[in-house]
């Protein structure tokens, strides 16, 4: 169905209530969550700004993918979570008014030290990508302090993703980023 949406693009708008009804009906089937997230991502791409009214319907199930015990390292669940991060990037500026719901999920994922490296890196890269589409000025502290903690304790691959994301946040926040520099310098000095 995601391929079909990719072909017909914005012409799917007339069928959105039915499509979202189908998505919500099938969501509890864990085996279908990855294809459903792919479908939602395709809808977000096809409709762009017209997708915004549907976000309140689809965000709760997407965020629910991150609920439950974090200890559970299930490959299928990790793939679905990574696809949800891709969907967040696809939603772009449409997601801005829901950042108060989305950011805690992303932060919790990249802060989790036992999490899969690929998933943690994807969460950090999601913040990086969103920083080019949405205004994080009201959420800077909630994002940057956990990033600094991750910078302090992670493997090199995750640390490099954190540094890239911090650079993107410097560009977006400009002089407002200055308040975080002493904290970063303190951690950077310890990491050397």
Identify the role of each PLM range:
Residues 1-192:
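Karyopherin-beta/Importin-beta family HEAT-repeat alpha-solenoid scaffold
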């Amino acid at each position: 169905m995601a391929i079909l949406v990719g072909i017909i693009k914005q012409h799917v708008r007339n069928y959105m209530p039915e499509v979202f009804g189908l998505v919500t009906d099938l969501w509890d089937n864990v085996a279908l969550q990855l294809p459903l997230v792919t479908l939602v991502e395709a809808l977000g791409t096809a409709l762009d700004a017209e997708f915004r009214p549907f976000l309140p319907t689809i965000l709760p199930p997407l965020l629910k993918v991150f609920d439950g015990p974090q200890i559970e390292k299930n490959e299928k669940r990790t793939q679905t979570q990574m696809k949800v991060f891709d969907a967040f990037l696809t939603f772009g500026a449409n997601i801005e008014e829901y950042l108060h719901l989305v950011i805690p999920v992303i932060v919790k994922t990249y802060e989790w030290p036992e999490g899969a490296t690929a998933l943690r890196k994807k969460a950090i890269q999601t913040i990086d990508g969103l920083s080019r589409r949405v205004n994080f000025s009201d959420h800077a502290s909630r994002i940057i302090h956990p990033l600094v903690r991750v910078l302090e304790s992670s493997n090199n691959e995750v640390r490099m993703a954190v540094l890239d994301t911090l650079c993107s946040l410097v560009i977006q926040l400009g002089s407002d980023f200055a308040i975080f520099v002493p904290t970063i310098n303190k951690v950077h000095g310890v990491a050397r």
